[in-house]
Protein backbone atom coordinates (compact mmCIF):
# COMPACT_ATOMS: atom_id res chain seq x y z
CA UNK A 1 0.00 0.00 0.00
CA UNK A 2 1.54 3.35 -0.98
CA UNK A 3 1.78 6.33 1.33
CA UNK A 4 -1.16 8.25 -0.08
CA UNK A 5 -3.39 5.20 0.12
CA UNK A 6 -2.25 4.64 3.69
CA UNK A 7 -3.17 8.19 4.63
CA UNK A 8 -6.49 7.80 2.85
CA UNK A 9 -7.19 4.71 4.94
CA UNK A 10 -6.67 6.86 8.02
CA UNK A 11 -9.44 9.30 7.10
CA UNK A 12 -12.08 7.91 9.51
CA UNK A 13 -9.48 8.09 12.26
CA UNK A 14 -8.53 11.64 11.34
CA UNK A 15 -12.15 12.70 11.24
CA UNK A 16 -12.45 11.63 14.86
CA UNK A 17 -9.07 12.88 16.07
CA UNK A 18 -9.73 16.69 16.45
CA UNK A 19 -7.28 19.49 17.33
CA UNK A 20 -3.71 19.91 18.55
CA UNK A 21 -0.87 22.29 19.34
CA UNK A 22 2.64 22.94 18.00
CA UNK A 23 3.22 25.15 15.05
CA UNK A 24 3.70 23.07 12.05
CA UNK A 25 2.01 24.55 9.06
CA UNK A 26 4.71 24.81 6.47
CA UNK A 27 6.78 21.99 7.79
CA UNK A 28 9.64 22.25 5.38
CA UNK A 29 8.99 25.57 3.66
CA UNK A 30 8.06 27.81 6.56
CA UNK A 31 9.32 27.63 10.10
CA UNK A 32 7.33 30.62 11.24
CA UNK A 33 4.92 28.36 13.11
CA UNK A 34 7.48 26.05 14.68
CA UNK A 35 6.78 25.70 18.41
CA UNK A 36 8.70 28.19 20.47
CA UNK A 37 9.09 27.63 24.17
CA UNK A 38 9.42 30.83 26.13
CA UNK A 39 8.41 32.16 29.54
CA UNK A 40 4.89 33.47 29.63
CA UNK A 41 5.34 37.08 28.80
CA UNK A 42 1.80 38.06 28.05
CA UNK A 43 1.43 37.27 24.36
CA UNK A 44 -1.21 39.58 23.07
CA UNK A 45 -2.88 41.15 20.13
CA UNK A 46 -0.15 43.69 19.67
CA UNK A 47 1.59 41.57 17.03
CA UNK A 48 -0.36 43.45 14.38
CA UNK A 49 1.96 46.40 14.59
CA UNK A 50 5.11 44.43 15.34
CA UNK A 51 6.63 44.26 11.87
CA UNK A 52 4.38 46.64 10.03
CA UNK A 53 5.83 47.71 6.70
CA UNK A 54 5.23 50.91 4.81
CA UNK A 55 3.41 50.71 1.47
CA UNK A 56 6.36 52.39 -0.19
CA UNK A 57 9.57 50.44 0.33
CA UNK A 58 12.85 52.04 -0.65
CA UNK A 59 10.97 54.75 -2.54
CA UNK A 60 8.81 52.35 -4.57
CA UNK A 61 5.29 51.02 -4.28
CA UNK A 62 5.10 47.26 -3.64
CA UNK A 63 2.34 44.68 -3.35
CA UNK A 64 3.85 43.49 -0.08
CA UNK A 65 3.79 47.01 1.30
CA UNK A 66 0.13 47.43 0.38
CA UNK A 67 -0.90 44.10 1.90
CA UNK A 68 1.11 44.55 5.09
CA UNK A 69 -0.35 48.03 5.59
CA UNK A 70 -3.98 46.84 5.56
CA UNK A 71 -3.94 46.13 9.34
CA UNK A 72 -7.74 46.11 9.81
CA UNK A 73 -9.29 42.69 9.21
CA UNK A 74 -12.35 44.12 7.44
CA UNK A 75 -10.14 45.25 4.58
CA UNK A 76 -9.66 42.69 1.81
CA UNK A 77 -6.34 41.27 0.66
CA UNK A 78 -7.99 39.99 -2.53
CA UNK A 79 -9.26 43.46 -3.47
CA UNK A 80 -5.73 44.78 -2.94
CA UNK A 81 -4.23 42.10 -5.21
CA UNK A 82 -6.85 42.69 -7.92
CA UNK A 83 -6.23 46.42 -7.87
CA UNK A 84 -2.49 45.78 -8.15
CA UNK A 85 -3.06 43.64 -11.25
CA UNK A 86 -5.48 46.16 -12.76
CA UNK A 87 -2.73 48.75 -12.50
CA UNK A 88 -0.64 46.57 -14.81
CA UNK A 89 1.64 44.99 -12.24
CA UNK A 90 2.55 41.31 -12.23
CA UNK A 91 1.91 39.00 -9.28
CA UNK A 92 4.51 36.32 -8.61
CA UNK A 93 3.95 33.25 -6.46
CA UNK A 94 7.26 33.54 -4.61
CA UNK A 95 6.34 37.11 -3.65
CA UNK A 96 2.93 36.05 -2.33
CA UNK A 97 4.53 33.22 -0.35
CA UNK A 98 6.89 35.73 1.27
CA UNK A 99 4.00 38.07 2.11
CA UNK A 100 2.00 35.21 3.64
CA UNK A 101 5.02 34.31 5.74
CA UNK A 102 5.34 37.90 6.97
CA UNK A 103 1.62 38.14 7.75
CA UNK A 104 1.75 34.93 9.78
CA UNK A 105 4.70 36.23 11.78
CA UNK A 106 2.65 39.23 12.88
CA UNK A 107 -0.50 37.13 13.42
CA UNK A 108 -2.45 38.63 10.53
CA UNK A 109 -3.95 35.26 9.72
CA UNK A 110 -7.13 36.44 7.97
CA UNK A 111 -5.28 38.35 5.26
CA UNK A 112 -2.77 35.51 4.89
CA UNK A 113 -5.66 33.07 4.36
CA UNK A 114 -7.27 35.34 1.78
CA UNK A 115 -4.04 35.34 -0.22
CA UNK A 116 -3.81 31.53 -0.04
CA UNK A 117 -7.40 31.17 -1.22
CA UNK A 118 -6.78 33.59 -4.08
CA UNK A 119 -3.75 31.56 -5.21
CA UNK A 120 -5.83 28.34 -5.29
CA UNK A 121 -8.11 29.69 -8.03
CA UNK A 122 -5.33 31.11 -10.22
CA UNK A 123 -4.67 28.78 -13.15
CA UNK A 124 -1.17 30.18 -13.71
CA UNK A 125 -0.04 29.45 -10.13
CA UNK A 126 1.16 25.92 -9.43
CA UNK A 127 0.79 25.06 -5.75
CA UNK A 128 3.22 22.82 -3.88
CA UNK A 129 2.71 20.58 -0.84
CA UNK A 130 4.04 23.30 1.45
CA UNK A 131 1.43 25.75 0.14
CA UNK A 132 -1.36 23.37 1.12
CA UNK A 133 0.21 22.90 4.55
CA UNK A 134 0.26 26.65 5.19
CA UNK A 135 -3.31 26.96 3.87
CA UNK A 136 -4.50 24.22 6.25
CA UNK A 137 -2.83 25.89 9.22
CA UNK A 138 -4.50 29.21 8.43
CA UNK A 139 -7.92 27.60 8.02
CA UNK A 140 -7.51 26.00 11.43
CA UNK A 141 -6.68 29.36 12.99
CA UNK A 142 -9.47 31.35 11.32
CA UNK A 143 -12.31 28.86 10.80
CA UNK A 144 -11.57 26.13 13.28
CA UNK A 145 -10.48 22.53 13.22
CA UNK A 146 -13.53 21.03 11.53
CA UNK A 147 -12.91 23.20 8.48
CA UNK A 148 -9.21 22.33 8.54
CA UNK A 149 -9.97 18.60 8.65
CA UNK A 150 -12.37 18.94 5.72
CA UNK A 151 -9.70 20.84 3.78
CA UNK A 152 -7.29 17.98 4.50
CA UNK A 153 -9.85 15.42 3.32
CA UNK A 154 -10.47 17.31 0.06
CA UNK A 155 -6.78 17.88 -0.67
CA UNK A 156 -5.28 16.21 -3.78
CA UNK A 157 -3.72 12.86 -2.84
CA UNK A 158 -0.24 13.91 -3.83
CA UNK A 159 -0.45 16.93 -1.50
CA UNK A 160 -1.55 14.92 1.54
CA UNK A 161 1.97 14.08 2.61
CA UNK A 162 4.52 14.99 5.24
CA UNK A 163 3.90 18.77 5.20
CA UNK A 164 0.09 18.60 5.31
CA UNK A 165 0.06 15.93 8.02
CA UNK A 166 2.51 17.96 10.10
CA UNK A 167 0.26 20.99 9.71
CA UNK A 168 -2.78 19.00 10.83
CA UNK A 169 -0.76 17.63 13.74
CA UNK A 170 0.06 21.21 14.67
CA UNK A 171 -3.63 22.09 14.74
CA UNK A 172 -4.43 19.12 16.98
CA UNK A 173 -1.68 20.08 19.42
CA UNK A 174 -2.79 23.71 19.53
CA UNK A 175 -6.29 22.58 20.39
CA UNK A 176 -4.96 20.20 23.07
CA UNK A 177 -6.50 17.07 21.53
CA UNK A 178 -3.92 14.53 22.57
CA UNK A 179 -5.79 11.44 21.36
CA UNK A 180 -6.08 12.80 17.84
CA UNK A 181 -2.49 14.00 17.89
CA UNK A 182 -1.15 10.64 18.99
CA UNK A 183 -3.26 8.76 16.43
CA UNK A 184 -2.08 11.01 13.60
CA UNK A 185 1.54 10.90 14.77
CA UNK A 186 1.44 7.09 14.78
CA UNK A 187 -0.07 7.06 11.28
CA UNK A 188 2.62 9.46 10.08
CA UNK A 189 5.24 7.01 11.35
CA UNK A 190 3.62 4.18 9.41
CA UNK A 191 3.63 6.34 6.28
CA UNK A 192 7.27 7.33 6.67
CA UNK A 193 6.37 10.97 7.27
CA UNK A 194 8.47 11.41 10.41
CA UNK A 195 11.53 12.47 8.49
CA UNK A 196 12.11 15.80 10.22
CA UNK A 197 12.19 16.83 13.86
CA UNK A 198 9.19 19.17 13.47
CA UNK A 199 6.43 16.59 14.18
CA UNK A 200 8.44 15.40 17.19
CA UNK A 201 8.76 18.96 18.43
CA UNK A 202 4.99 19.35 18.26
CA UNK A 203 4.47 16.20 20.31
CA UNK A 204 7.13 17.24 22.82
CA UNK A 205 5.40 20.59 23.17
CA UNK A 206 2.09 18.86 23.85
CA UNK A 207 3.49 16.46 26.44
CA UNK A 208 5.29 19.26 28.26
CA UNK A 209 2.16 21.44 28.34
CA UNK A 210 0.24 18.47 29.79
CA UNK A 211 2.92 17.75 32.39
CA UNK A 212 3.68 14.34 30.87
CA UNK A 213 7.42 14.75 31.33
CA UNK A 214 8.07 11.01 31.45
CA UNK A 215 7.26 10.82 27.71
CA UNK A 216 9.89 13.39 26.75
CA UNK A 217 13.09 11.25 26.91
CA UNK A 218 11.35 8.33 25.16
CA UNK A 219 10.26 10.56 22.29
CA UNK A 220 13.66 12.22 21.99
CA UNK A 221 15.33 8.80 21.83
CA UNK A 222 13.01 7.82 18.96
CA UNK A 223 13.62 11.17 17.25
CA UNK A 224 17.39 10.64 17.30
CA UNK A 225 16.97 7.23 15.64
CA UNK A 226 14.87 8.61 12.77
CA UNK A 227 16.28 12.11 12.30
CA UNK A 228 18.30 14.85 14.00
CA UNK A 229 17.06 17.20 16.73
CA UNK A 230 17.29 20.96 16.23
CA UNK A 231 17.68 23.75 18.78
CA UNK A 232 13.88 23.86 19.26
CA UNK A 233 14.00 20.20 20.30
CA UNK A 234 16.66 21.00 22.88
CA UNK A 235 14.76 24.06 24.09
CA UNK A 236 11.70 21.88 24.66
CA UNK A 237 13.80 19.28 26.46
CA UNK A 238 15.33 22.07 28.53
CA UNK A 239 11.85 23.33 29.39
CA UNK A 240 10.84 19.88 30.63
CA UNK A 241 13.67 19.93 33.18
CA UNK A 242 13.03 23.58 34.03
CA UNK A 243 9.38 22.79 34.77
CA UNK A 244 10.58 20.52 37.57
CA UNK A 245 13.24 23.01 38.73
CA UNK A 246 15.88 20.43 37.78
CA UNK A 247 18.97 22.60 37.30
CA UNK A 248 21.37 19.69 36.86
CA UNK A 249 19.20 18.02 34.21
CA UNK A 250 18.71 21.30 32.34
CA UNK A 251 22.43 22.03 32.30
CA UNK A 252 23.16 18.55 30.90
CA UNK A 253 20.71 19.19 28.06
CA UNK A 254 22.33 22.57 27.38
CA UNK A 255 25.77 20.93 27.15
CA UNK A 256 24.40 18.20 24.85
CA UNK A 257 23.11 20.86 22.47
CA UNK A 258 26.54 22.47 22.42
CA UNK A 259 28.15 19.08 21.76
CA UNK A 260 25.79 18.64 18.79
CA UNK A 261 27.15 21.93 17.42
CA UNK A 262 23.71 23.53 17.78
CA UNK A 263 23.86 27.21 18.61
CA UNK A 264 21.69 28.17 21.59
CA UNK A 265 19.18 30.90 20.73
CA UNK A 266 17.52 33.55 22.89
CA UNK A 267 14.85 31.04 23.95
CA UNK A 268 17.54 28.72 25.35
CA UNK A 269 18.92 31.44 27.60
CA UNK A 270 15.45 32.69 28.49
CA UNK A 271 14.51 29.25 29.83
CA UNK A 272 17.80 28.99 31.73
CA UNK A 273 17.47 32.48 33.20
CA UNK A 274 13.97 31.75 34.40
CA UNK A 275 15.06 28.42 35.90
CA UNK A 276 18.04 29.95 37.71
CA UNK A 277 15.89 32.80 39.04
CA UNK A 278 13.28 30.35 40.37
CA UNK A 279 15.93 28.27 42.12
CA UNK A 280 17.79 31.28 43.62
CA UNK A 281 20.87 30.82 41.42
CA UNK A 282 21.04 34.59 40.97
CA UNK A 283 24.55 34.85 39.53
CA UNK A 284 23.89 32.11 36.97
CA UNK A 285 20.60 33.82 36.09
CA UNK A 286 22.39 37.10 35.41
CA UNK A 287 25.01 35.40 33.26
CA UNK A 288 22.34 33.58 31.23
CA UNK A 289 20.41 36.83 30.83
CA UNK A 290 23.51 38.56 29.47
CA UNK A 291 23.88 35.78 26.89
CA UNK A 292 20.23 36.17 25.97
CA UNK A 293 20.64 39.94 25.49
CA UNK A 294 23.40 39.33 22.95
CA UNK A 295 20.96 37.35 20.80
CA UNK A 296 17.97 39.69 20.97
CA UNK A 297 17.44 41.97 17.98
CA UNK A 298 14.75 43.53 15.83
CA UNK A 299 14.45 40.25 13.93
CA UNK A 300 13.09 38.46 17.00
CA UNK A 301 11.05 41.25 18.52
CA UNK A 302 9.00 38.88 20.67
CA UNK A 303 12.12 38.33 22.80
CA UNK A 304 12.00 41.87 24.22
CA UNK A 305 8.87 41.17 26.27
CA UNK A 306 10.55 38.11 27.76
CA UNK A 307 13.70 40.13 28.45
CA UNK A 308 11.74 42.76 30.38
CA UNK A 309 9.98 40.10 32.47
CA UNK A 310 13.24 38.34 33.31
CA UNK A 311 14.93 41.57 34.43
CA UNK A 312 11.93 42.18 36.70
CA UNK A 313 12.16 38.66 38.13
CA UNK A 314 15.74 39.48 39.14
CA UNK A 315 14.68 42.78 40.70
CA UNK A 316 16.69 44.71 38.12
CA UNK A 317 14.90 48.06 37.66
CA UNK A 318 17.68 49.50 35.52
CA UNK A 319 17.60 46.46 33.25
CA UNK A 320 13.82 46.79 32.83
CA UNK A 321 13.98 50.50 31.99
CA UNK A 322 16.98 50.17 29.68
CA UNK A 323 15.29 47.35 27.74
CA UNK A 324 12.10 49.40 27.42
CA UNK A 325 14.12 52.38 26.19
CA UNK A 326 15.77 50.15 23.59
CA UNK A 327 12.42 48.80 22.39
CA UNK A 328 10.99 52.31 22.06
CA UNK A 329 14.00 53.47 20.07
CA UNK A 330 13.85 50.42 17.79
CA UNK A 331 10.16 50.47 16.82
CA UNK A 332 7.68 53.19 15.95
CA UNK A 333 4.93 51.71 18.07
CA UNK A 334 4.93 49.33 21.01
CA UNK A 335 2.65 46.31 20.82
CA UNK A 336 0.37 44.91 23.52
CA UNK A 337 2.80 42.17 24.52
CA UNK A 338 5.46 44.77 25.27
CA UNK A 339 3.12 47.02 27.26
CA UNK A 340 1.85 43.98 29.12
CA UNK A 341 5.33 42.82 30.13
CA UNK A 342 6.52 46.35 30.99
CA UNK A 343 3.51 47.28 33.13
CA UNK A 344 3.65 43.90 34.86
CA UNK A 345 7.38 44.38 35.50
CA UNK A 346 7.12 47.83 37.08
CA UNK A 347 4.15 46.74 39.21
CA UNK A 348 6.25 43.82 40.45
CA UNK A 349 9.07 46.25 41.24
CA UNK A 350 6.73 48.48 43.27
CA UNK A 351 6.61 51.33 40.75
CA UNK A 352 2.83 51.73 40.55
CA UNK A 353 2.91 55.38 39.45
CA UNK A 354 5.13 54.41 36.53
CA UNK A 355 2.73 51.57 35.72
CA UNK A 356 -0.22 53.98 35.62
CA UNK A 357 1.72 56.31 33.32
CA UNK A 358 2.48 53.42 30.99
CA UNK A 359 -1.19 52.45 31.00
CA UNK A 360 -2.20 56.00 30.03
CA UNK A 361 0.29 55.81 27.17
CA UNK A 362 -1.05 52.43 26.01
CA UNK A 363 -4.65 53.66 26.20
CA UNK A 364 -3.82 56.65 24.00
CA UNK A 365 -2.08 54.68 21.23
CA UNK A 366 -3.66 51.20 21.17
CA UNK A 367 -7.06 50.36 19.81
CA UNK A 368 -6.96 46.63 20.53
CA UNK A 369 -9.07 46.72 23.69
CA UNK A 370 -6.94 43.97 25.22
CA UNK A 371 -8.40 43.60 28.74
CA UNK A 372 -5.26 41.95 30.09
CA UNK A 373 -3.49 45.31 30.25
CA UNK A 374 -6.03 47.27 32.35
CA UNK A 375 -6.44 44.14 34.47
CA UNK A 376 -2.85 44.65 35.71
CA UNK A 377 -3.71 48.12 37.02
CA UNK A 378 -7.08 47.02 38.41
CA UNK A 379 -5.48 44.10 40.26
CA UNK A 380 -2.84 46.36 41.82
CA UNK A 381 -5.48 48.80 43.06
CA UNK A 382 -7.29 45.90 44.70
CA UNK A 383 -4.08 44.41 46.12
CA UNK A 384 -3.43 47.78 47.77
CA UNK A 385 -6.98 47.83 49.20
CA UNK A 386 -7.69 50.96 47.18
CA UNK A 387 -11.09 49.60 46.23
CA UNK A 388 -12.79 52.91 45.48
CA UNK A 389 -9.97 53.91 43.13
CA UNK A 390 -10.16 50.44 41.62
CA UNK A 391 -13.89 50.82 41.01
CA UNK A 392 -13.34 54.19 39.33
CA UNK A 393 -10.66 52.63 37.17
CA UNK A 394 -13.05 49.81 36.23
CA UNK A 395 -15.61 52.43 35.15
CA UNK A 396 -12.92 54.05 33.03
CA UNK A 397 -12.19 50.71 31.34
CA UNK A 398 -15.84 50.28 30.42
CA UNK A 399 -16.18 53.90 29.22
CA UNK A 400 -13.24 53.30 26.88
CA UNK A 401 -15.13 50.41 25.30
CA UNK A 402 -12.91 47.65 26.69
CA UNK A 403 -14.92 44.52 27.39
CA UNK A 404 -14.23 43.09 30.86
CA UNK A 405 -12.69 39.63 30.63
CA UNK A 406 -13.08 36.67 32.95
CA UNK A 407 -9.98 37.84 34.81
CA UNK A 408 -11.49 41.31 35.29
CA UNK A 409 -14.49 39.84 37.05
CA UNK A 410 -12.32 37.46 39.07
CA UNK A 411 -10.15 40.35 40.29
CA UNK A 412 -13.27 42.20 41.45
CA UNK A 413 -14.68 39.03 43.04
CA UNK A 414 -11.54 38.53 45.15
CA UNK A 415 -11.50 42.21 46.16
CA UNK A 416 -15.09 42.14 47.37
CA UNK A 417 -14.57 38.79 49.09
CA UNK A 418 -11.73 40.36 51.06
CA UNK A 419 -14.19 43.07 52.17
CA UNK A 420 -16.85 40.44 52.94
CA UNK A 421 -19.30 42.16 50.57
CA UNK A 422 -21.05 38.98 49.44
CA UNK A 423 -23.70 40.68 47.32
CA UNK A 424 -21.00 42.15 45.07
CA UNK A 425 -18.98 38.92 45.26
CA UNK A 426 -21.85 36.89 43.86
CA UNK A 427 -22.69 39.51 41.23
CA UNK A 428 -19.10 39.59 39.90
CA UNK A 429 -18.67 35.84 40.22
CA UNK A 430 -21.80 35.25 38.14
CA UNK A 431 -20.55 37.65 35.47
CA UNK A 432 -17.18 35.88 35.47
CA UNK A 433 -18.82 32.52 34.76
CA UNK A 434 -21.06 34.05 32.08
CA UNK A 435 -18.04 35.61 30.33
CA UNK A 436 -16.58 32.25 29.24
CA UNK A 437 -17.93 29.35 27.20
CA UNK A 438 -16.61 26.75 29.62
CA UNK A 439 -15.68 27.73 33.14
CA UNK A 440 -12.49 26.28 34.61
CA UNK A 441 -13.20 25.80 38.29
CA UNK A 442 -11.26 28.07 40.64
CA UNK A 443 -11.46 25.84 43.71
CA UNK A 444 -9.78 28.37 46.01
CA UNK A 445 -12.27 31.08 45.08
CA UNK A 446 -15.26 28.78 45.54
CA UNK A 447 -13.99 27.62 48.93
CA UNK A 448 -13.37 31.21 50.01
CA UNK A 449 -16.88 32.27 49.04
CA UNK A 450 -18.45 29.25 50.75
CA UNK A 451 -16.48 29.87 53.95
CA UNK A 452 -17.54 33.52 54.16
CA UNK A 453 -21.19 32.68 53.48
CA UNK A 454 -21.05 30.04 56.21
CA UNK A 455 -19.54 32.46 58.72
CA UNK A 456 -22.21 35.05 57.91
CA UNK A 457 -25.02 32.48 57.98
CA UNK A 458 -26.01 34.01 54.64
CA UNK A 459 -28.54 31.46 53.38
CA UNK A 460 -29.78 33.62 50.52
CA UNK A 461 -26.23 34.14 49.28
CA UNK A 462 -25.36 30.46 49.67
CA UNK A 463 -28.38 29.46 47.61
CA UNK A 464 -27.44 31.99 44.92
CA UNK A 465 -23.89 30.60 44.83
CA UNK A 466 -25.27 27.07 44.50
CA UNK A 467 -27.43 28.19 41.56
CA UNK A 468 -24.40 29.78 39.84
CA UNK A 469 -22.32 26.64 40.33
CA UNK A 470 -25.13 24.36 39.13
CA UNK A 471 -25.39 26.48 35.99
CA UNK A 472 -21.62 26.11 35.51
CA UNK A 473 -21.85 22.32 35.96
CA UNK A 474 -19.89 22.21 39.20
CA UNK A 475 -21.79 20.65 42.10
CA UNK A 476 -20.51 18.13 44.64
CA UNK A 477 -21.05 16.79 48.15
CA UNK A 478 -18.73 19.36 49.74
CA UNK A 479 -20.75 22.23 48.26
CA UNK A 480 -24.00 20.83 49.61
CA UNK A 481 -22.38 20.33 53.01
CA UNK A 482 -21.28 23.97 52.96
CA UNK A 483 -24.83 25.01 52.08
CA UNK A 484 -26.16 22.95 55.00
CA UNK A 485 -23.59 24.45 57.39
CA UNK A 486 -24.78 27.90 56.30
CA UNK A 487 -28.37 26.92 57.12
CA UNK A 488 -27.21 25.56 60.47
CA UNK A 489 -25.35 28.80 61.26
CA UNK A 490 -28.52 30.77 60.47
CA UNK A 491 -30.63 28.38 62.54
CA UNK A 492 -32.84 27.57 59.57
CA UNK A 493 -34.21 24.33 58.16
CA UNK A 494 -32.95 23.23 54.74
CA UNK A 495 -35.81 21.53 52.90
CA UNK A 496 -35.73 18.74 50.27
CA UNK A 497 -31.92 18.62 50.29
CA UNK A 498 -31.80 14.90 49.56
CA UNK A 499 -34.09 15.35 46.55
CA UNK A 500 -31.98 18.24 45.25
CA UNK A 501 -28.80 16.21 45.62
CA UNK A 502 -30.35 13.26 43.81
CA UNK A 503 -31.38 15.57 40.97
CA UNK A 504 -27.76 16.81 40.73
CA UNK A 505 -26.40 13.23 40.93
CA UNK A 506 -24.54 14.07 44.13
CA UNK A 507 -24.09 11.50 46.89
CA UNK A 508 -24.63 12.10 50.59
CA UNK A 509 -21.78 11.42 53.00
CA UNK A 510 -21.93 11.07 56.80
CA UNK A 511 -21.53 14.82 57.34
CA UNK A 512 -24.43 15.50 54.96
CA UNK A 513 -26.71 13.13 56.88
CA UNK A 514 -25.73 14.68 60.21
CA UNK A 515 -26.30 18.22 58.91
CA UNK A 516 -29.71 17.27 57.49
CA UNK A 517 -30.64 15.78 60.87
CA UNK A 518 -29.40 18.91 62.67
CA UNK A 519 -31.18 21.45 60.44
CA UNK A 520 -34.41 19.44 60.36
CA UNK A 521 -35.00 20.57 63.94
CA UNK A 522 -34.71 24.26 63.03
CA UNK A 523 -37.28 26.78 61.86
CA UNK A 524 -38.65 26.97 58.32
CA UNK A 525 -38.02 30.38 56.77
CA UNK A 526 -39.06 32.23 53.64
CA UNK A 527 -35.86 31.11 51.85
CA UNK A 528 -36.47 27.47 52.80
CA UNK A 529 -40.03 27.59 51.51
CA UNK A 530 -38.97 29.28 48.26
CA UNK A 531 -36.37 26.58 47.55
CA UNK A 532 -38.83 23.79 48.27
Curated annotation (Swiss-Prot):
GO terms for cellular component: mitochondrion. Pfam families: PPR, PPR_2. PPR repeats lie at residues 161-195, 196-226, 230-264, 265-295, 300-330, 335-365, 370-404, 405-435, 442-472, 476-512. Residues 35-56 are annotated as: Disordered. Residues 1-28 form a transit peptide. It comes from the Eukaryota. Belongs to the PPR family. P subfamily. This is Pentatricopeptide repeat-containing protein At4g02820, mitochondrial. It comes from Arabidopsis thaliana. The lineage of its organism: Eukaryota, Viridiplantae, Streptophyta, Embryophyta, Tracheophyta.
Amino acid sequence: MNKNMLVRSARPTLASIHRLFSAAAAATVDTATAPVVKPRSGGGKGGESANKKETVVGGRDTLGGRLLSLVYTKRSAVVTIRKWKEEGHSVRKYELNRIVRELRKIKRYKHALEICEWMVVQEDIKLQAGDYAVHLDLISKIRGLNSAEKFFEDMPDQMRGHAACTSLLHSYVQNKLSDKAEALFEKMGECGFLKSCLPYNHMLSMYISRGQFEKVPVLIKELKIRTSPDIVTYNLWLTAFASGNDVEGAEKVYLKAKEEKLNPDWVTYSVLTNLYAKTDNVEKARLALKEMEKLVSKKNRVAYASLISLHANLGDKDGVNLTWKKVKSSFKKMNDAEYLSMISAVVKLGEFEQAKGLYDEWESVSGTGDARIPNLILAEYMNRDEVLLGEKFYERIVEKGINPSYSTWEILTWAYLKRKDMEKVLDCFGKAIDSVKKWTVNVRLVKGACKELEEQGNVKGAEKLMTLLQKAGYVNTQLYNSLLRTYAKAGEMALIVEERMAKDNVELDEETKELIRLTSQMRVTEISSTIS
